[in-house]
Amino acid sequence: MIPAIFLMGPTASGKTELAVRLADALPIDIISVDSLLVYRHFDIGSAKPSLALRQQYPHALVDIREPDEPYSAGLFREDALHCIALARERGRIPLLVGGTGLYFRALECGIDTLPPANPALRQSLMALAETAGWPALHQRLATLDPEAAAGIAPHDRQRIQRALEIILGSGQTISGARHWQGTFPGPLYKIILRPPRSWLHQRITQRFDVMLNEGFLDEIADLSARHYAPELPAMRAVGYRQYFTWHDGLCSAAEAYQAALAATRQLAKRQDTWFKRESAHYYLDPSRDDASSLLLQMATRPRQGEVHSIGWDNG
């Protein structure tokens, strides 16, 4: 059976560029693993591959939902498994590319089972958040379960609420309460991008400047005119959330810019923390000039489950 390849890494680490270069050399079907790219209309601020690029290098699971349509790790797993099967039927390599760690985990390990919602506890947490604020509840989460808190932004109300609900209701950490059910069909090889932090921060700034030049503020105005509910996941996404605040007149453009950069760096840090906990066959420094050729080596050389650090010093 044709192996699937996971290409994982933090935001702005060059995943798309590397994926299309690999597609120039191998018969590859690119499958997006990104919880924001599934939504239509969120194009510039998400760094969604351009329509022209996607016409040349099709990306599955991009623009498959309206922003107010629900989507989840479970639905992603169903969609991705279907795309993988289609690629293999055509004799092509499924290349799954993205930075949404939970989607990768769900695809590889199946869907996690967690305790059901507790309405009374949820109401109590909501009331506490009204008075203390979500960052305070995030600090409480960090005390109870540092690992879970490290992967959740201080203003991510939905995930903070759910995490505290599980911990306080079950008396267990998230990892202790979580049980994954499922397996991945066929062989799988994982490649994790590990960029130098200074290089990644520079890329984040450069990419954000490009977004602004490409019309990100117009995109914010267009999305605001569509009157989507502010609590929708896409509306709370990094970059968008900060500029919706600006659009509503609650901060200056300079403040929104700095807040968006800081939030994007924090997102990259959380993603890096997640991927450090993942096992992989290969690790790659994408800042190297020969990163594309090294990736091709990783995708084609024989493997027997061994771990390689090609082009990356883990010392």
Swiss-Prot record:
Its cofactor is Mg(2+). The gene is miaA. It comes from Acidithiobacillus ferrooxidans (strain ATCC 53993 / BNL-5-31). The keyword Disulfide bond does not apply. Belongs to the IPP transferase family. This is tRNA dimethylallyltransferase. It comes from the Bacteria. The keyword Endoplasmic reticulum does not apply. Its EC number is 2.5.1.75. Substrate binds at residues 11-16. Transmembrane segments: none annotated. Monomer. InterPro entries: Dimethylallyltransferase, IPT, P-loop_NTPase. ATP binds at residues 9-16. It catalyses: adenosine(37) in tRNA + dimethylallyl diphosphate = N(6)-dimethylallyladenosine(37) in tRNA + diphosphate. Keywords: ATP-binding, Magnesium, Nucleotide-binding, Transferase, tRNA processing.
